[in-house]
Amino acid sequence: MIELTVAQIAEIVGGAVADISPQDAAHRRVTGTVEFDSRAIGPGGLFLRLPGARADGHDHAASAVAAGAAVVLAARPVGVPAIVVPPVAAPNVLAGVLEHDNDGSGAAVLAALAKLATAVAAQLVAGGLTIIGITGSSGKTSTKDLMAAVLAPLGEVVAPPGSFNNELGHPWTVLRATRRTDYLILEMAARHHGNIAALAEIAPPSIGVVLNVGTAHLGEFGSREVIAQTKAELPQAVPHSGAVVLNADDPAVAAMAKLTAARVVRVSRDNTGDVWAGPVSLDELARPRFTLHAHDAQAEVRLGVCGDHQVTNALCAAAVALECGASVEQVAAALTAAPPVSRHRMQVTTRGDGVTVIDDAYNANPDSMRAGLQALAWIAHQPEATRRSWAVLGEMAELGEDAIAEHDRIGRLAVRLDVSRLVVVGTGRSISAMHHGAVLEEAWGSGEATADHGADRTAVNVADGDAALALLRAELRPGDVVLVKASNAAGLGAVADALVADDTCGSVRP
C-alpha cells in the first residue's frame, strides 16, 4: 500500500480516530500491509477488525498493535489506536466474512476498506498503473496465474493469492499495490447482479477479460441470462481508451462486444479470433500444446497446467500481455514456463508408486466438473497403458433448482467417460442424484464389464472425506489415476493433500 497517515485514512473512509490524539494521527503513518488476520500483521500495518465464527476481530486488536500495527480499522473503540467507522446495514455481497456480522460492524469495515482501496487505486492509476479485471463462471484463478506469469517480464505484478475475488479479497488485493507496481490483476466474482459493477468502481480496469458464462452460483442468480448480464458488467466498466478481451467461442461472451465502448480483442481456438490457438494436442498428463497466433506472428506453446480447457485461459492471458506490449514469442515462452501456482486447482502429482493425483478440490460447477472428468479420462486412457481411474467427487454448491439434474448429469458423464470407480462424497439430495445417475447410466448401457476394468467399475456413496480416504487407501493400486473435485465447502482438499502426502506404496495394494 502507498504510505498514508492515520489522519489521511480516517478522512478517506469517513471515520474518527480513537485512542490516539489528532496530533499523533497526523504524524503516524501506515507503511505496511493491510491485514484481516492479526497473525499476519507486521510493522506499520493496518489491521481490519472483522467478525469471525469463534472470535470477534475486536478481541485481536491489541495483539495486532503489539505486533506492530500502526492502527486498527474498526466499528467501535478497541482500546488501542483506531479509526472508527459507524455500523451500516449489510449489503448483498459475496464476502462470507459477513456471515457472522450481527451488528453491521463488519459491513462498516468492508465499506471503509472499499473507500480506501478506491482512493489508493486512483492515485496509482494516475501514476501509470494498469489494472486488469478478470471474470467468468470458471477459470478465473487459473487465468490469473497464467496472466501474472506472462506479465512478469514486463514489470512488477500484483495478483491475488488463490481466489481473493470478493468484497474483501478485491480491495485487499488493490491495497497490496505500491508505487512500484506496474500491473494489478484482479479477479472479480459475483453471486448477485451488480457485484462486478461494484468491484469495478473500486479499481476501474483499463483491460477487462471475460472467460465464459456458465452455471456457477446459478441458484443465487436465478438464470443463466442474469449470469451473463452480471459478467457483462466488466466490459461495460472498461473505458473507450481500454480493451476488452472476450472468449469468442462462448456465444454469451461474444455477444458482450456490443455492450462495451472499449476496443474488443477476441480469442478463439480457431482462426476467427484476433488471438487464437492452432491445433491443440494433449500430452500424457493432459497438458495442452498448441501454436499461438496473433499480430501476424506465431509461436509454439507447451502449457505446464492440466486440462484442455486451459487453452482458452492461456489465450486470454496472452491477449492481455500482447496489449501491454509483449511479443508473441515472449508470451509463448512465458506461458510454457508458467507452473501451476494456486493450490487445489488442477494440480497433478505422480507419486513414486505411479499413482497420479489430480487435485482440483478448491471449487466445482458443472462446467469445471466436466473439464476435470475429461482430463481424468485422457490421462487414464493413454494408448500405451490404460490405467484404472477414480473420480472422487463432492457436491457442486449453489445450483438452485438445477442442482439435482446437474449432479445426475455428472454421475452419468463419469460412466460415459469410462471412469473405473466413482466415489461420491457426502449426503443430501444432490449427492444422491450424482450417485444414482451413475448407477442408472451403467444399467442403461450394455451392462457388460469392459475388458480394461472388468467388474471393478462401480459407483459408491460415502459419508465424508475421511470415509473416502479410507476407501482409497484400501483400494488404490500402483498406476491408478485419481481426480478429487468438489465445491470448497465439501473439504475434499484434505483428501487430495493426504493422498499426495502418503508414503510411496505405503498405502497402496501391490
UniProtKB/Swiss-Prot annotation:
Record's keyword annotation contains Methyltransferase: no
GO annotation (BP), single: regulation of cell shape
Reactions catalysed according to its record: D-alanyl-D-alanine + UDP-N-acetyl-alpha-D-muramoyl-L-alanyl-gamma-D-glutamyl-meso-2,6-diaminopimelate + ATP = UDP-N-acetyl-alpha-D-muramoyl-L-alanyl-gamma-D-glutamyl-meso-2,6-diaminopimeloyl-D-alanyl-D-alanine + ADP + phosphate + H(+)
SUPFAM superfamilies: MurD-like peptide ligases, catalytic domain, MurD-like peptide ligases, peptide-binding domain, MurE/MurF N-terminal domain
Physiological role: Involved in cell wall formation. Catalyzes the final step in the synthesis of UDP-N-acetylmuramoyl-pentapeptide, the precursor of murein.
HAMAP family tied to this protein: MurF (MF_02019)
Protein name (Swiss-Prot/TrEMBL): UDP-N-acetylmuramoyl-tripeptide--D-alanyl-D-alanine ligase
Phylogenetic classification of the source organism: Bacteria, Bacillati, Actinomycetota, Actinomycetes, Mycobacteriales
